[in-house]
């Protein structure tokens, strides 16, 4: 995938493929096939009811009718959320279509910027374009908006700020993404990860990175403002019991220890190999084999590439943590510590970002160290993109 005169056509090709991917929604309109991940949380219906209620700016205890015999306004997203206004201004399906377009476009460019600026370099733009396209056609859980799709873009901005190479656009990304994403589903864990990077710099490099600290504080503050209704629900008793809370309160009893360990092992391996419904990275058939080859190259050639095994390890640990949370072994702890129940282990929403970092780094090693590596990488990327279509 070395640079050449044909590379100038790659952006046009990837753009065309993205248009083809989205085109059924445009051509067939409301007759299109739409994937529904979770019937309990079809957010377009909830937002439609909110828009029709006239309570977008309502008080916390204002009642939204026609849903569970009425729910308080604080149980739904705040008026600072972009998706609320998409549904209000354009209606459910146009809002869904616009949301899908934004997700795909930002996913592509965010991953492209992350790869070319920080991971594979600008001399491998075709590789970056292909991996970014595969990332853009993942089956995203649309109710979380840009919570997953924007992570590469936000990470790229944070890394530039960390290195002191930031521009105004990087601060705009960090300041604006909270209006179109979810703190609860993904970004609380993303912010925690950035905080750990800041602590690492503080301890290992003896450096108080003011800009990185400021960026973390800025994004956290904006999220707290955008999600103020969620914060209100956490702190004050509204008298409303959500489906999630009711489900948690009926958590099964603690299983026998060894049976619980068995469940953890099986679920960890299954999540690692197959992924989940809401955070599916489509890693099974092409990304994992690429990662295996990449790790074999590291072992055989003694290549100093620490990010690949580190990212793979993080994925495995997240699968292990999620399986442990759901095993039942933590039930006594959940009953005693309220916040464990509130913050479901949605660090799994970081997995698509990590899997595609692993994919890109593995393909880079294949290109550099395997005979006909460029051809192999091209085939793997093409198959992964095709897999995303189905």
Model segments located where?
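Signature aromatic-anchored transmembrane alpha helix within multi-pass, membrane-resident enzymes
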Residues: 126, 364-389
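Start-transfer (signal-anchor) and selected internal transmembrane alpha helices
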Residues: 1-28, 125, 211-215, 377
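Transmembrane alpha-helices and membrane-interface helical segments
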Residues: 109-117, 152-164, 194-202, 290-298, ...
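Membrane-helix boundary/interfacial segments in multi-pass membrane proteins
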Residues: 138-146, 304-368, 390
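Membrane-interface coil-to-helix junctions
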Residues: 19-108, 145, 236, 252-262, ...
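Periplasmic/ER-lumenal interhelical loops and adjacent helix-loop junctions
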Residues: 227-300, 345
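Membrane-embedded helix bundles of polyisoprenyl
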Residues: 108-118, 123-203, 215-232, 384-389
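Hydrophobic alpha-helical membrane-interfacial segments at the cytosolic entry of transmembrane helices
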Residues: 13-19, 207-231, 246-250, 312-315, ...
